[in-house]
Curated annotation (Swiss-Prot):
Residues 414-724 form the NACHT domain. The gene is CIITA. It comes from the Eukaryota. This is MHC class II transactivator. Essential for transcriptional activity of the HLA class II promoter; activation is via the proximal promoter. Does not bind DNA. May act in a coactivator-like fashion through protein-protein interactions by contacting factors binding to the proximal MHC class II promoter, to elements of the transcription machinery, or both PubMed:8402893, PubMed:7749984,. Alternatively it may activate HLA class II transcription by modifying proteins that bind to the MHC class II promoter. It catalyses: L-seryl-[protein] + ATP = O-phospho-L-seryl-[protein] + ADP + H(+); L-threonyl-[protein] + ATP = O-phospho-L-threonyl-[protein] + ADP + H(+). Interacts with ZXDA and ZXDC. Interacts with PML (isoform PML-2). Interacts with TAF7; interaction inhibits CIITA acetyltransferase activity, thereby repressing transcription. It comes from Homo sapiens. Residues 269-303 are annotated as: Disordered. It is found in: Nucleus; Nucleus, PML body.
Length: 1130
């Protein structure tokens, strides 16, 4: 809003001459301030120019009103202003009137919708300068600002005034017609260097008309027009910059850092004050809601305007956290309660340990995707990517969350799900996010709230969003109402973490549940979560979930905006963790010995890809190494946990371990892993369990809340209860192995580690298993259960089980260490094992390899879409009993390259000879590219002197299907044609595969050129490829090259007309080996059909000609069929 000082009565302005003089007019006292001035003949520019030239000595002082301790409005203040306007009817009406006035004054291009009565709502109390008098008369030559109905009808040639120049404490913004001349003086030289005493530095937004010929701007080319003072950003470096193309309506921006003193052109204070607009409620900033703030200026990055601390976005190690609580004093501060809550929340998260025992080894975060599903089910499964096509999230958690902010629409909630198996470190990863925010590595968020999902399984319907953020977590947060109001105004700067999503009850209906639309309405916790997932509550926030996937994902997870998986430790990361563990324990002398113990147990080494199990191995190794040099780790997972709990059970109260096992089982039945202190049967049991580390307080949890330190420990204790309990009938025990699906089972296998531990506890020798935990009396009670399970396992037929159940059976048999069961399982394995689409973890690959070696027969493995790691693939391929295998092309080529680099010639030769791709179906562009890499590998080998011969996979390929569809098909087909001649044994080329590839005439022409090299081709399927007469002509020209081999030719459902039919009829007698030809659903007429029928009579070798098409009269087709029965109309 312009801040103008009306001239006192009796002033005169000179007549304009050219473009620099003003018309002579008499100005009397103006009453009503802005409104009368707008309707008067006074030109504000001339008025100010007149004051600039006149001697003000002896005149009444005119003072610009300035509020002390004010600043330009920022985004947070403006948001509060809007919220208060919405709640106050009078304020909302007043600001609506001001908005109409602003639109009338400044937005000239939108005058069509305004009228004179926009001022009728402004009362006398809102009129500025009401004590001033109206002029008696105005000059006839002055122009009033016309109202819309007074404007000419043709507004096309009407040009709005140039945008005003804006000068801030650090910025000067304005239109510049010619910026070739840079200012020769520092920017303060444009104004008074030494303002008069008593004058205030401008702290509000003012606009002062400046003539272009002003001497003070002689070195800076600015057009005539108003200059606006906005003292805002003071963090820019000293200097003056010009930024072109700054934004709409501004041709240039001049940025200057430094104090801007009072302008010399402003008249000294007078007897009256020109008041500003009403100050907006709860806002210490500018007196005008339309004054631009720092956030309104172009080219300013958001973090520089909204970050509450001096934070850096680059990576910071957990041990090098900057001072997170240091708040910039150059930015507008939050209210004191918000600042205090912000600091306390940072202190809370920053005090949490980096990992178990303070050890942190970061695991890889992999982008996940869902399987394509043609069913209508809302639940979908995770796809299993090949090892080579995994997409790692570069930059870790910070990059994931930064990308989430960049790719979402404004005010749109972003849901991110991080998935992982039990023990992969999801909860520690979620804690790492909170610590990263506390250390200043996530400046895009003002607040982070981490809530374990087990805290949300509470009854009642009187909860609100404020309870979810502050009260329902493990440790309630103290926050004033002002903090909650601040959060609601900026939800896009809030990160909410829900850890352990699998522990929520009825988690599959959040997207369809009803919830209150307003945050203040109380509802159930389920309603609150539904409001978050339906993006009605706290809309615009980032919602981060961690969950353990079990089969199909519920819709709340499958509909997430981004999916990631924790891949666990690699072999190198596991060994690094072992080294750091013993280093932190002060036992560096045992580091090498511990690694040797681990390498001697390949199963435990493969299980160490799980951070939880890797830590358990380190704990047991530490205990064994303290006993002596002859220490050895157990060979099974059951033995690992027996070793960990055996020492704790030695000095336990009577029955304490059994009571703890029962408690773990009951919690697992309810999908829970946390418990209260009063749930223990006695205080002695609780004290013992806490002292031995079997239960512990979760981070930031209440004193009465306890949890098992790992999910696998809970599974082991649950299996221990099943092995000891007399409450479970023996005949029901096999159901808990979960190897054969049943419609009714006692539990849903939520404790997914129970089957393996149960087999190990029951079948392993009692002296080193149950007897070591509970004594000889407990071991005697499992004899009957052992017989029941042995009978059940020996009746199973491994060849009838699904791949996942077969792997679980192998794990159970391995844990049992019972020779009869192991021999039965491995000898019943089928010769062809397919794990297509079933994920193979490192322990799966190890147990499978042991079973294949013990079987004593040859096997063919299908390892496609299993995500098997390179070391696991190499170990299986290297087995002598594996004669053939299929795996992802990219993984196999990478394995060959690795073996060649390491000089493993024999293993490389075996891997090349055993690999097959028969049959091969290309369903994506990546499949075609991988096939091209395979052919390129063969060509490289052929040109090398030390190797010779074709790759068996390329040489023996007989069937190739191309099914990319109409979008990718035309793009990928030329790449396939270029490598097609490498498959010398190709017999079946299917370019239909129930998908319209639409290779067209161009594709047929390219394919025809390869026919002379495809000597073995017997079946050619070109159906549904948009082939016309031109394509049929090209095909007919090249078909004689296949005369000796081609048996079946299909051109079903193309666009072949009579000319194309004639071309095919002409070549048909030359195809001496052809037996079946299909030209149904084309566009040729009776003439084309008759030519084909006539040619067929000269081809006694052809058995069937399918040629029904709707363009031929049925009577003609029937007549042709009567003449030759080989014509098929079906």
């Amino acid at each position: 809003m312009r801040c103008l000082a009306p001239r006192p009565a009796g002033s005169y302005l000179s007549e304009p001459q050219g473009s620099s003089q003003c018309a002579t007019m008499e100005l009397g006292p103006l009453e009503g301030g802005y409104l009368e001035l707008l309707n008067s003949d006074a030109d504000p520019l001339c008025l100010y120019h007149f004051y600039d030239q006149m001697d003000l000595a002896g005149e009444e002082e005119i003072e610009l009103y300035s509020e002390p301790d004010t600043d330009t409005i920022n985004c947070d203040q403006f948001s509060r202003l809007l919220c208060d306007m919405e709640g106050d009817e009078e304020t909302r009406e007043a600001y609506a009137n001001i908005a109409e006035l602003d639109q009338y004054v400044f937005q000239d291009s939108q005058l069509e919708g305004l009228s004179k009565d926009i001022f009728k709502h402004i009362g006398p109390d809102e009129v500025i300068g009401e004590s001033m008098e109206m002029p008696a008369e105005v000059g006839q030559k002055s122009q009033k600002r016309p109202f819309p109905e007074e404007l000419p009808a043709d507004l096309k040639h009407w040009k709005p005034a140039e945008p005003p120049t804006v000068v801030t404490g650090s910025l000067l913004v304005g239109p510049v017609s010619d910026c070739s001349t840079l200012p020769c003086l520092p920017l303060p030289a444009l104004f008074n260097q030494e303002p008069a005493s008593g004058q205030m530095r401008l702290e509000k937004t003012d606009q002062i008309p400046m003539p272009f010929s002003s001497s003070s701007l002689s070195c800076l080319n600015l057009p005539e027009g108003p200059i606006q003072f906005v003292p805002t950003i003071s963090t820019l470096p000293h200097g003056l910059w010009q930024i072109s193309e700054a934004g709409t309506g501004v041709s240039s921006i001049f940025i200057y850092h430094g104090e801007v003193p009072q302008a010399s052109q402003v008249p000294p204070p007078s007897g009256f004050t020109v008041h500003g607009l009403p100050t907006s409620p709860d806002r210490p900033g500018s007196t005008s809601p339309f004054a631009p703030s720092a956030t309104d200026l172009p080219s300013m990055p958001e973090p520089a305007l909204t970050s509450r601390a001096n934070m850096t976005e680059h990576k910071t190690s957990p041990t090098q956290c900057p001072a997170a609580g240091e708040v910039s004093n150059k930015l507008p501060k939050w209210p004191e309660p918000v600042e205090q809550f912000y600091r306390s929340l940072q202190d809370t998260y920053g005090a949490e340990p980096a990992g178990p025992d303070g050890i942190l080894v970061e695991v890889d975060l992999v982008q996940a995707r869902l399987e394509r599903s043609s069913s209508k089910s809302l639940e979908r499964e995770l796809a299993t990517p090949d090892w080579a096509e995994r997409q790692l999230a570069q930059g870790g958690l910070a990059e994931v969350l930064l990308a989430a902010k960049e790719h979402r629409r404004p005010r749109e909630t972003r849901v991110i799900a991080v998935l992982g198996k039990a023990g992969q470190g999801k909860s520690y990863w979620a804690g790492a996010v909170s610590r990263a925010w506390a250390c200043g590595r996530l400046p895009q968020y003002d607040f982070v709230f981490s809530v374990p999902c087990h805290c949300l399984n509470r009854p009642g319907d009187a909860y609100g969003l404020q309870d979810l953020l502050f009260s329902l977590g493990p440790q309630p947060l103290v926050a004033a109402d002002e903090v909650f109001s601040h959060i609601l105004k900026r939800p896009d700067r809030v990160l909410l973490i829900l850890d352990g999503f699998e522990e929520l009850e009825a988690q599959d209906g959040f997207l369809h549940s009803t919830c209150g639309p307003a945050p203040a309405e109380p509802c159930s916790l389920r309603g609150l979560l539904a409001g978050l997932f339906q993006k009605k509550l706290l809309r615009g926030c980032t919602l981060l979930l961690t969950a353990r996937p079990r089969g199909r994902l519920v819709q709340s997870l499958s509909k997430a905006d981004a999916l990631f998986e924790l891949s666990g430790f690699s072999m190198e990361q596991a060994q690094a963790y072992v080294m750091r563990y013993f280093e932190s324990s002060g036992m560096t002398e045992h580091q090498d010995r511990a690694l040797t113990l681990l390498r001697d147990r390949p199963l435990l080494l493969s299980h160490s890809h799980s951070p939880t199990l890797c830590r358990a191995v380190c704990q047991l190794s530490e205990a064994l190494l303290e006993l002596g040099e002859d220490a050895k780790l157990p060979s099974t997972l059951t033995g690992l946990y027996v070793g960990l709990l055996g020492r704790a059970a030695l000095d336990s109260p009577p029955g304490a371990l059994a009571e703890l096992a029962k408690l773990a089982w009951e919690l697992g039945r309810r999908h829970q892993s946390t418990l209260q202190e009063d749930q223990f049967p006695s205080a002695d049991v609780r004290t013992w369990a806490m002292a031995k580390g079997l239960v512990q307080h979760p981070p930031r949890a209440a004193e009465s809340e306890l949890a098992f330190p790992s999910f696998l420990l809970q599974c082991f204790l649950g299996a221990l209860w099943l092995a000891l309990s007399g409450e479970i009938k023996d005949k029901e025990l096999p159901q808990y192995l979960a190897l054969t699906p049943r419609k009714k089972r006692p539990y849903d296998n939520w404790l997914e580690g129970v089957p393996r531990f149960l087999a190990g506890l029951i079948f392993q020798p009692p002296a080193r298993c149950l007897g070591a935990l509970l004594g000889p009396s407990a071991a005697a009670s499992v004899d009957r259960k052992q017989k029941v399970l042995a009978r059940y396992l020996k009746r199973l037929q491994p060849g009838t089980l699904r791949a996942r159940q077969l792997l679980e059976l192998l794990h159970c048999a391995h844990e049992a260490e019972e020779a009869g069961i192991w021999q039965h399982v491995v000898q019943e394995l089928p010769g062809r094992l397919s794990f297509l689409g079933t994920r193979l973890t490192p322990p799966d690959a190890h147990v499978l390899g042991k079973a294949l070696e013990a079987a004593g027969q040859d096997f063919s493995l299908d390892l496609r879409s299993t995500g098997i790691c390179p070391s696991g693939l190499g170990s299986l391929v290297g087995l002598s009993c594996v004669t053939r295998f299929r795996a992802a092309l990219s993984d196999t080529v990478a394995l060959w390259e690795s073996l060649q680099q390491h000089g493993e010639t024999k293993l490389l030769q075996a891997a090349e000879e055993k690999f097959t791709i028969e049959p091969f179906k290309a369903k994506s562009l990546k499949d075609v590219e991988d096939l091209g890499k395979l052919v390129q590998t063969q060509r490289t080998r052929s040109s090398s002197e030390d190797t010779a011969g074709e790759l068996p996979a390329v040489r023996d390929l007989k069937k190739l299907e191309f099914a990319l569809g109409p979008v990718s098909g035309p793009q990928a087909f030329p790449k396939l044609v270029r490598i097609l001649t490498a498959f010398s044994s190709l017999q079946h080329l299917d370019l239909d595969a129930l998908s319209e590839n639409k290779i067209g005439d161009e594709g047929v022409s390219q394919l025809s050129a390869t026919f002379p090299q495809l000597k073995s081709l017997e079946t050619l399927n070109l159906s549904q490829n948009n082939i016309t007469d031109l394509g049929a002509y090209k095909l007919a020209e090249a078909l004689p090259s296949l005369a000796a081999s081609l048996l079946r030719l299909s051109l079903y459902n193309n666009c072949i007309c009579d000319v194309g039919a004639e071309s095919l009829a002409r070549v048909l007698p030359d195809m001496v080996s052809l037996r079946v030809m299909d030209v149904q659903y084309n566009k040729f007429t009776a003439a084309g059909a008759q030519q084909l029928a006539a040619s067929l009579r000269r081809c006694p070798h052809v058995e069937t000609l399918a040629m029904w098409t709707p363009t031929i009269p049925f009577s003609v087709q029937e007549h042709l069929q009567q003449q030759d029965s080989r014509i098929s109309l079906r």
